[in-house]
Amino acid sequence: ADGMEIVGEITEDTNFVYGAESVSAEKLDKLYEDKLEKVYSCNITDEAKTVESFSYKAESYPAPAVKCARPKVLIPAFPGTNCEFDSAKAVSDAGAEPEIIVIKNLTSSAIQSSVEEFATKLKIAQMVFIPGGFSGGDEPDGSGKFITAFFRNAAVKEGVTDLLENRDGLMCGICNGFQALIKLGLVPYGKIIDTDENCPTLTFNTIARHQSKIVRTRIASNKSPWLSLTNVGEVYNVPISHGEGRFLASEELIRKLAENGQIATQYVDLSGNATNDVQFNPNDSMFAIEGITSPDGRVFGKMGHSERIGSGLYKNVPGNYDIKMFEAAVKYFK
C-alpha cells in the first residue's frame, strides 16, 4: 500500500531469513528449550514417535432406572484439594446441584465425622466428582493416598457400591481424583477392589517434574455417559497440571481396555496422532492414554482439567476446550 514499507513476508518453509542469514524454527526452538538444560535437566532424548490411536464408537448408552431433572453431585474437598470451586461451577453451569463437602482430618473424631457426613449425603446423591489438587501435599509419593484411604472406609465403600450397582449413579475423578480412582480399582474395574501389581497405575512423569501446560486430547471412545456429547476422533484442548500422570499397564490389559471401549482419551500432536512426544504427551503415558473408564463407562477418570474452562480463558491458545462432559452427565439422568 502507498506510504507503507514492507519489512518482511511469510514463506512456506519454517526458516527465519534476514539478508543472507537463515535460521530454522527447529534450531531456535532448541536454543530456547535448552537454555537452562544444564541447570534443570528435563528434555527427553528418546526419539518421539506416534503410537496407535484407538477408536470405539458407542452404539448405545446405559440409562438410570430413576430420572432426575437436577442431579445432586457430591464434591469431596480433601486436604490439598484445589479444584473444588472450579468443579462446582462447572457442575452448576451444566444444570446439576453441586455440594462441596470438606473432609476434615485435624483429629480422628473429625475424620470419623467427615466419613459419616459423606456416607449420609451419598445416599441421596446421583454423582460423585473427585476434584484435583495435591492430596496430603502429595506426600509420601502422592497419588491420592489419603483419598483412597477415605473411600476404603466401610461406610463410604458401601455407599459407592450402592450408588454404582443399585442406583445407576456416575463417578468422575480428574487429576488427583483420577489417581484415587485408579488406586481404588474403580477404573478400569468399576468397583472398589484390592489392587495389586497387575493393575494399572499412574506414576511420575518421565521428566521427573511437574508439568503445567495446554495439551491436545483425542476422543478414543465415547462409550461413557460422560462423553456422550462427543464424537470419536474429535480433538479438544485441555489444561494439565500434575507431576504424576504417567499411565502404566501391561500391553495385554491395554488391548483389552481398547477392545471394550474403556480407553476414553489420548494425547495427540498437532496432526491429531497419538504420540509419546513429551511436548504433547507430557507424562509419557503408555499408548498416550489420558483418560479411561469403567467397563460400563459410568466411572470416568482423566488427568486433564476439563472443568477449568470459561469465557475469556486461554485466548492465546486457540482450540476447542469444551468437552461438555458435565452437560452429558446431566443429560444421562433426564
Residue ranges and their predicted role:
Residues 2-21, 99-105, 199-208, 266:
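Beta-strand->loop->alpha-helix junctions that form or flank phosphate-binding loops
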Residues 56-143, 153, 227-228, 234-237, ...:
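Extended, subdomain-level signal for the structured scaffold at the beginning of enzyme domains
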Residues 111-113, 118-120, 159-162, 194-334:
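Amide-donor transfer/coupling interface in amidating biosynthetic enzymes
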